[in-house]
Amino acid sequence: MTVRVLQTGLHPERVDFDAPEFKRFEGLTEDKLRQANDDNVAMLREAGFDVVNVLIRNGDTPEDVVRKAMEQGPFDALLIGAGVRLVADNTLLFEGLVNLLHAAYPNARFVFNQAAETSPDDINRWFEGPEVKAPLQ
């Protein structure tokens, strides 16, 4: 069976690229974020992972959007994007998503990528490839 990945993050329209908390992502624009997300999903699929990608838009209730995506589960690996994880103003969002996902998938592994292009390797920290369902200890 193929390792199933739920990747979630902020839709580019939801990000205020001029806000101080996003200044750490130097040079990031709506187009660059959209392309990075698309490239990340493509790389994961090319590496053999089964990926469901859900992006949280303006006006969305994040937990509801993720719950809807969870209907496509179960998932083995749960990847939450840097815009959620690394921005202090999104701490409650990050906490809520972690608790929601952990309650639904207590045996899944959370994967925090170092960069979009490293996601396949980051998932492989926990799995010995896309066809191995049992996570490494």
What are the residue ranges of the model-derived segments?
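N-terminal, charge-rich interaction modules
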Residues: 1-23
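The AdoMet/dcAdoMet-binding core of the Class I SAM-like
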Residues: 13, 31-35, 116
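Short catalytic helix/loop segments, enriched in acidic residues and glycine
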Residues: 23-42
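Short, glycine-/small-residue-rich phosphate/pyrophosphate-handling segment
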Residues: 24-25, 47, 53, 113-137
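Ser/Thr/Gly-rich flexible loops in soluble cytosolic domains mediating phosphotransfer, phosphorylation
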Residues: 36, 93-130
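Acidic/glycine-enriched edge-of-secondary-structure segments
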Residues: 42-61
